[in-house]
Amino acid sequence: MEKNITVIKGDGIGPEIVNEAIKILDVIADKYNHKFNYTQILMGGASIDEYGVPLTDEALEIAKKGDSVLLGAIGGDTTTSPWYKLEPNLRPEAGLLKIRKELGLFANLRPAVFYDELKEACPLKEELITGGFDMMIMRELTGGLYFGKRTTKKENGQLVAYDSMSYSETEIRRIAKRAFDIAMKRNKKVTSVDKANVIDTSRLWRKVVSEVAKDYPEVTLEHMLVDNCAMQLVKDPKQFDVILTENMFGDILSDEASMVTGSIGMLSSASLREDKFGMYEPSHGSAPDIAGKNIANPIATILSAAMMLRYSFDLDREANVIEEAIEKVLKQGYRTSDIMSDGKTLVGTKEMGDLIVANM
């Protein structure tokens, strides 16, 4: 198989962690007779420094022509970086919003996987997490409150702010279908999260998701109110397989789930459109304070590369090899500084990548 991958190393620790992911992909290519062609583009602060904008039209066109995008991290220190003295539409994160919109990425997948080997890092009681857990949060990315009309105006002598939230049947149906498709590859359970006892968009959400579920009789569907889901994530995380929800709820719940796992340095993510194209990136930020020190955890980025193999290229076997190698390294006791605990062996970014290669 030959695939063209657009690489955006980005800012901060981005270049270091992406280099380790490419190292892993190259091993996969050699082992299974694939060919991955990499084309690098700039985005975020790196693009601002070079071109004065967070994403050039030329870079965007390159990304559109590829089969997928592998991204490191975008942004810098918001209190000290000159990038954040620019207008909002010229700041690093504006490039990320633009590329998501222009590439039509509407579905955000964020796995929250807890490894039994990292239980010391988890804030939950041991009896809640023994044996680990593995859930996938599917968040709608282009609709809802974040993309609705908004205004602030003066009424009766005081400021009043308005935000509007809307979802169409089409928007809900396409994200629901993607969630059920992914559940079919996993444990065949979807938990659809809404606020249908109060909000009209949630009532429509529940109706459309229930209709889509009829096409997937093998998958168990349950509906859960968002406040209950927030509680259940810390009370019994092992009950979840695929959590399907709208934009704002997904934003909040995915951050909560990441904290439950113990380290955001372990969490990958994918943003997909209706075909096989996707953009893959770690859930964490650019960590400018540790950039260039060879101490960043590359595992989230390497797991993002594994997601790319699975969801964009249909290479499930190859993705499994990467994920199993990471588990082996953790069982052997190797840790980067963010997941370090007593009695374990501290390694750097490059060393962690090499250890994963050695276990493949």
Where do the model's predicted regions map?
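Buried hydrophobic positions in well-ordered alpha/beta secondary-structure cores of metabolic enzymes
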Residues: D11-G14, D67, M138, A179, ...
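Glycine-rich phosphate/diphosphate-binding loop of Rossmann-like nucleotide-binding domains
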Residues: T6-K23, I28-A29, E155-D227, Q239
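N-terminal glycine-rich phosphate/adenylate-binding segment common to multiple enzyme folds
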Residues: D49-Y162, M248
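Generic secondary-structure signature for well-ordered alpha-helical cores
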Residues: D26, D30-H34, K65-S68, K101-N108, ...
